[in-house]
UniProtKB/Swiss-Prot annotation:
This is TATA-binding protein 2. Signal peptide: none annotated. The gene is TBP2. General transcription factor that functions at the core of the DNA-binding multiprotein factor TFIID. Binding of TFIID to the TATA box is the initial transcriptional step of the pre-initiation complex (PIC), playing a role in the activation of eukaryotic genes transcribed by RNA polymerase II. GO terms for cellular component: nucleus.
Length: 203
């Protein structure tokens, strides 16, 4: 049942609980991808012709374009480089990037679709128990920075896989820096026993 629920949540392939011994599967919240349209772009012309585009060169040297399906935002640069953010899965990110490329083609530019690459996957989950961040920071000092007056979460820089985790006292976890989703899952399974070790005992 848990696996089915998780698969329904993910909206993609079914989840193998052998791979997720904690029984918790981080939800992908944001995918950042890049692609090279491989042609020079006139950003002013794009901003004038595309209805879902804004361009303020004094503020930022790229056209900001949005589409509703998949709900994403693209940053389009004069060099032909494009960054796509906001998708909830790798497939959606690629689909969105292709849609932006097609919009640029329809505006008369010879845009191609080269070197599509996932640059960052952001996932999150909730372990459903409070965590003693001071204790965790103390015993994992080499990987942790915890300065509650600056930021309420503990920042944990995992070496293998190379993932940054934000760990909150509430038990909410954010994982960032993955290039493939399995890195997100592995990082969470690595940290889970540590989190249970520093579980706050409710008085």
């Amino acid at each position: 049942m848990a696996a089915e629920a998780a698969a329904a949540l993910e909206g993609s392939e079914p989840v193998d609980l052998a791979k997720h011994p904690s029984g918790i599967i981080p939800t992908l919240q944001n995918i950042v991808s890049t692609v090279n349209l491989d042609c020079k772009l006139d950003l002013k012309a794009i901003a004038l012709q595309a209805r879902n585009a804004e361009y303020n060169p004094k503020r930022f040297a790229a056209v900001i374009m949005r589409i509703r399906e998949p709900k994403t935002t693209a940053l389009i640069f004069a060099s032909g480089k494009m960054v796509c953010t906001g998708a909830k899965s790798e497939q959606q990110s690629k689909l969105a990037a292709r849609k932006y490329a097609r919009i640029i083609q329809k505006l008369g530019f010879p845009a191609k679709f080269k070197d599509f690459k996932i640059q960052n996957i952001v996932g999150s989950c909730d372990v459903k128990f409070p965590i003693r961040l001071e204790g965790l920071a103390y015993s994992h000092g080499a990987f942790s920075s915890y300065e509650p007056e600056l930021f309420p979460g503990l920042i944990y820089r995992m070496k293998q896989p190379k993932i940054v985790l934000l760990i909150f006292v509430s038990g909410k976890i954010v994982l960032t820096g993955a290039k493939v989703r399995d890195e997100t899952y592995t990082a969470f399974e690595n940290i889970y026993p540590v989190l249970t070790e520093f579980r706050k005992v409710q008085q």
